[in-house]
Amino acid sequence: MLYLSRDIIVKKNRTYLIYVVFFFQDVDCQCRVKSMSDTEKSPSVLLEELDRLRLLACNMKEARSIQERLEILNADHIVKEFFKNQSLDQAFPSEVSIEGEAAIKSVIAIGQAGRVFAVSAGALEVSDRLRDVLEILLRVDRFYSSIGGIVGYHWSVISLFASSLEINCDKRSFIPPVGIDIAMKNREVLDNIAVGIERIKELAEIYAVGGAADRLRLQDPETGMPLPAARLTFAGKTLLETLVVDVQAREYLYFKLFGEQLTTPIALMTSEEKENHQQILSLCNEQKWFGRPRGSFFLFCQPSVPAVDREGNWCMTGMMRLLLKPGGHGVIWKLAKDCGVFDWLLEQGRKKALVRQINNPIAGIDDGLLAFTGIGLSQDKVFGFASCPRQVKSAEGINVVVEKQDNSGFSYCLTNIEYCDFKKHQITDEPAAPGSTYSKFPSNTNILFVDLAAISKNIDKMPIPGRLINFKKTEFQTEDGGIKELEICRLESTMQNIADELIDTFSQSLAAEDFFRFKTFLTYNKRHKTISTVKKEYVIGGPLLETPEGCYLDFFRNAHDLLSNYCRFSVPDFDECVPSFFFTYHPALGPLYSIIAQKVRVGKIHPGSALELNIAEVDIEGLDLQGSLRIAAENVMGEVDGLGVLQYGRGSGKCQLKNVVVQNLGISLDSQRDFWRGSFKHEEICEIFLEKDAEFLAENVTLAGGLSIVVPRGTRVRAVQGKDGVSF
């Protein structure tokens, strides 16, 4: 049993009022989940306890005031039993607010007080620890108030644990969706790409960047401290920079076509995990906000939530130290509304938004996002999924059309179902055709198109969409410095399942070819141009899926496709294991392949060579590369003005190469271990660097050996082939 007794101590001539927490184990958690080995044979949670918590959570949700919530908690028999032998004055210090009292009693009601408020023998920091844990509990209680606060959070976790063993017997049909194949460049798709460019000023971008990246084991090389996914360097840029540069490339394309500079507002949902929020702020400051106005970004932080073990208990890292993890990206909508993100975007005339995740760096390749958003804009859709083929039996969610019949007719919902729920919904993961390795259901990629008003209207109906739990073995550090591994879960949620509330109703059943009548939509594209994630560290001999190495091979597959099929280059054959050459480019070079093919035409790249084009304005034809070539402009898209804002088109560097041969020793073989990071050691390299608005021209020349050509601003340099070599 818990009680707080008052002790007065004097320290450094100051008097402190200390509230010491004591526990007895006679009132313990009555809400226990059995181990998974037991749950496979019997229900994992006592039904009576589930019903009690469900009713308590519902009552807490419906309460109209904090006083009413407190009355509900005081009436709970677990709370009553807890206070049978002590008064409220003994249990709670006067400094605890009524909200804090409700939070503590909520923890008592769910049976976790004996863990959350446990005090180590001889502890001296009790009051500070209590204050800290109360702050966390209050944040959880407030954020999840729409589902019953702390009680609703805990009930959701254990009820999901129990329901994961049940079969959903609703009379619903799950139908493969019919979407627009944007890989087929027919007139409809080309028109929508054009719309995606022309109407970019109507669009905002929202990024979920709070990923913990536990499985990547990302650490600061100097301090050893863990780092969030946004800090991972991939193909020469951090994952956060990749997302921002992608949108800048589309803005730059709009500028080149229409002569108008746009600044797309970007909202970033961060998290508290691994100091993610502060890391994102630091990264933005280091990059000087990527040459964008500081006010064009809106950072909002998702709450961390208590982790729960297989026994249904909250996990602790020390005395009154909860193990906290991000609560899933499904909170993005409620959090965005609560923090004013929607209002901020609407004030800027943005009614639609593109949503992306931090761990998928290839989504901006070519014209996929422009076609996707173009369809959503031209057809005024309220929600969209950018989808692609999915391997049968892969651990990925699927996009489905859910059909349900009732007395009013037929209802349809284009949505997502996570792979861990297939059994629950009796979904069979079958191939699209006999012998195919691809599923009949396409992959959910978490690339979304949203109508802000429609989403805002549905948040109250579904504040935490797609609730789920997923147990994972997780290592964490205890306060004594030790490393502990537990199989844990927390209440997660999925942002894409806000679509569950976007239902279309018809009097008659619809044929698949009529699904275009939905207010939602789906596109198909090639998988390697849609999604390839970086979620975990590669283990030698293990699968490449979801590793940086695997993602880079998809990145290289796209580069191979671009050069061979669009730019008409002769390149080495594609290797499924290791890149046979390296090619990286700034997205502003296109980003459309059709535009890049106008700037880079006909040539040859020899095996093991590396071509890096960190420039937008180039004219390359007949290049023969055997070794390493890097062309970099200080001003890729323009010049930064006195306010630190990038002005598109002002003083960009330019380069023209016609029938140029580059020969050098190229990449050092021992530098290819972490090739996916994009930083190589070169035995020799030909590097052309253009300061500010500098220009470099070369025609019918051979650039041999290691060369460093720096062209000063305001200067045009021409390379000329002579008998004794090249002169400039």
Regions flagged by a language model, labelled:
Residues L2-L4:
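Intrinsic disorder
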Residues K12-F22:
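Positively charged N-terminal leader segments that act as targeting/secretion signals
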Residues R6-D7, V20, C29:
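Short, low-complexity, intrinsically disordered N-terminal modules
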Residues D170-Y207, R215-Q496:
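Domain-scale recognition of functional cores that engage charged ligands
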Residues F23-D26, C31-R199, G374-F728:
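Left-handed beta-helix
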